[in-house]
Design a protein with these regions (language model features):
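Active-site- and interface-proximal helix/loop "cap" or "latch" segments in soluble metabolic
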Residues: 25-334
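Sec-dependent N-terminal signal peptides of Gram-positive bacterial secreted proteins and lipoproteins
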Residues: 2-22
Length: 334
């Protein structure tokens, strides 16, 4: 009998041990955006310009605050206008990572670490991401020297470009990290989708290029989203009939603006519950709705008007237009 009990006890212990080994630690996920803008006025035959540079970072962070995965991308969007106040039509906006070898950094970049190789932008971003893995946010901040380039570790990894915006975006991403169902086995991806609306200046009204840039970070497993974060940046370049223009240097996303965005005061109660949530609250509702879906499922969250969400999304409290968020979320989930 004792032998039987001993065997049974060992079996139970083995089952418990294997059950414990089967548990996978869930991680926090965060997304951060660092963006700045600059502008030059038009002068004679030289067009004025407006430029938005927005870097997005996504991180998976463990219980010790160490980065398990990191993803980066940058949108460098430029627009022009003439000295007569005419908005020049913008072309397609493609991120630096998505440009791949077409960014052509290898042909014109500098060999700052002396190894005889200049990597493309996306390769250098990959190198910086790899250096971040296993580090805390303070250790990532310590990678930056002279306010612009990376230290010897970053350089040796093959990332010789300026990394100040990378560091700032990663710092924000870690600060924004929240508990999720994502694990180290998941795929992490970021996405940026940009659009611009333009109008010419008149004698009585300013012209403008108005950007809307949507960001998404998705952790996926088997094609299904385990964690999602979304955000949007609005940036406007106004110019007069002579092409004079100014722009704010540093920009805040709508999530960062929080209650200062003031959607609750002026938004519409489209679902009839008597409540209008702030933009960041509605974006959180949208992001939550994406969890468990694949890219096609996220696309299906958009109603037939191609602007608002479906009824279930509106009932949950996301009554604003979500087409740009959905485009970014779909791209991140693919």
């Amino acid at each position: 009998m004792k032998k039987i009990l001993s065997v049974a006890l060992v079996a139970l212990m083995l089952v418990a041990a294997f059950a414990g080994c089967g548990k996978t630690e869930t991680l926090k996920m965060g997304m951060g955006v660092y963006a700045s803008a600059s502008a030059t006025s038009a002068d004679g035959d030289t067009n004025g310009t407006g430029e938005v540079v927005a870097t997005v970072a996504a991180v998976l962070v463990d219980k010790d605050g160490k980065i398990v995965k990191c993803e980066l991308d940058t949108a460098d969007n430029s627009v022009e206008f003439t000295s007569a106040g005419v908005a020049v039509a913008a072309g397609e906006f493609v991120t630096k990572y998505d440009l791949g070898t077409n960014y052509n950094m290898a042909a014109y970049g500098s060999d700052n670490n002396g190894d005889g190789v200049v990597k493309e932008w996306f390769e250098q971003a990959d190198a910086f991401e790899a250096v971040c893995v296993g580090k805390t946010v303070d250790e990532v901040k310590a990678l930056l020297v002279n306010g612009y380039t990376g230290n010897d570790e970053v350089m040796a990894a093959g990332c010789t470009i300026g990394v100040a915006d990378f560091v700032k975006a990663v710092e924000k991403a870690v600060a924004n990290a929240v508990d999720t169902g994502a694990t180290a086995n998941d795929t992490l991806k970021v996405a940026i989708v940009s659009a611009v609306e333009s109008k010419d200046a008149t004698a009585d009204a300013a012209g403008a290029h108005e950007f809307e840039i949507a960001f998404a970070a998705a952790a996926t497993n088997g094609g299904k989203v385990t964690a999602m974060a979304t955000d949007t940046l609005a940036a406007s370049f106004e110019f007069d009939a002579k092409g004079a223009c100014t722009a704010a240097e540093e920009l805040k996303t709508k999530n960062e603006l929080g209650t200062a965005y003031n959607m609750a005061a002026y938004g519409s109660d489209n679902n009839g519950d008597g409540v209008v949530k702030e933009w960041n609250e509605q974006a959180a509702v949208f992001s939550t709705a994406c969890v468990g879906l694949d890219a096609n499922g996220i696309s299906a969250l958009i109603s037939d008007d191609y602007y608002h969400g479906v009824e279930s999304l509106q009932t949950a409290g996301c009554t604003m237009g979500v087409s740009m968020l959905a485009k970014a979320a779909v791209k991140a989930a693919q």
